[in-house]
């Protein structure tokens, strides 16, 4: 049974401007430390996809970025197959448990101008 669903689209140009203006400081505010360690040399699509995933996740949780949940509480981790896996930390994990969710699913995509993500929480 689905207990949460979220979707988000991020414009690559907006993320590129933030990266150009703030560089690694922007990435450190948005990414979980494990994601920051994997930041590629050309990071805009990577950052945009993860930003979209985090926005989609807080929509699925029904909280937005509030109630003590921030972007660093949400991690997108690649499985050995390359498939993205959503890992929640801190208050995001607690909210997920309160919803009764026992499984999380995330799908990422990006094109020339945008990145998008869908998150499903399931019990």
UniProtKB/Swiss-Prot annotation:
EC number(s) stated in the UniProt entry for this protein: 2.7.8.7
Primary enzyme class: transferase
UniProt GO BP: fatty acid biosynthetic process
Pfam families noted in UniProt: ACPS
Keyword Cell inner membrane: no
Keyword Transferase: yes
Gene3D superfamilies for the chain: 4'-phosphopantetheinyl transferase domain
Catalyzed reactions: apo-[ACP] + CoA = holo-[ACP] + adenosine 3',5'-bisphosphate + H(+)
Binding-site positions, Mg(2+): 8, 55
GO cellular component: cytoplasm
Co-factor requirement: Mg(2+)
Compartments reported by the entry: Cytoplasm
Molecular function terms, GO-annotated: holo-[acyl-carrier-protein] synthase activity; magnesium ion binding
InterPro entries attached to this UniProt entry: 4-PPantetheinyl_Trfase_dom, 4-PPantetheinyl_Trfase_dom_sf, ACPS, Ppantetheine-prot_Trfase_dom
Keywords: Cytoplasm, Fatty acid biosynthesis, Fatty acid metabolism, Lipid biosynthesis, Lipid metabolism, Magnesium, Metal-binding, Transferase
First-listed, main subcellular location of the protein, grouped into a coarse class: cytoplasm
Domain of life: Bacteria
Protein task: Transfers the 4'-phosphopantetheine moiety from coenzyme A to a Ser of acyl-carrier-protein.
Family: Belongs to the P-Pant transferase superfamily. AcpS family.
Protein known as: Holo-[acyl-carrier-protein] synthase
Annotated organism of origin: Nitratidesulfovibrio vulgaris (strain DSM 19637 / Miyazaki F) (Desulfovibrio vulgaris)
């Amino acid at each position: 049974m689905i207990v949460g669903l979220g979707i988000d689209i991020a414009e690559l140009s907006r993320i590129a401007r933030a990266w150009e203006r703030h560089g690694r400081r922007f990435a450190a505010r948005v990414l979980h430390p494990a994601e920051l360690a994997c930041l590629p040399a050309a990071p805009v699509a990577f950052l945009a996809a993860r930003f979209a995933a985090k926005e989609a996740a807080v929509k699925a949780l029904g909280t937005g970025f509030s109630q003590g949940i921030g972007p660093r509480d949400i991690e997108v981790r690649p499985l050995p197959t390359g498939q993205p896996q959503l890992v929640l930390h801190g208050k995001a994990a607690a909210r997920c448990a309160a919803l009764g969710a026992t499984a999380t699913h995330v799908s990422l995509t990006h094109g020339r101008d945008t990145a998008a993500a869908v998150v499903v929480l399931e019990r």
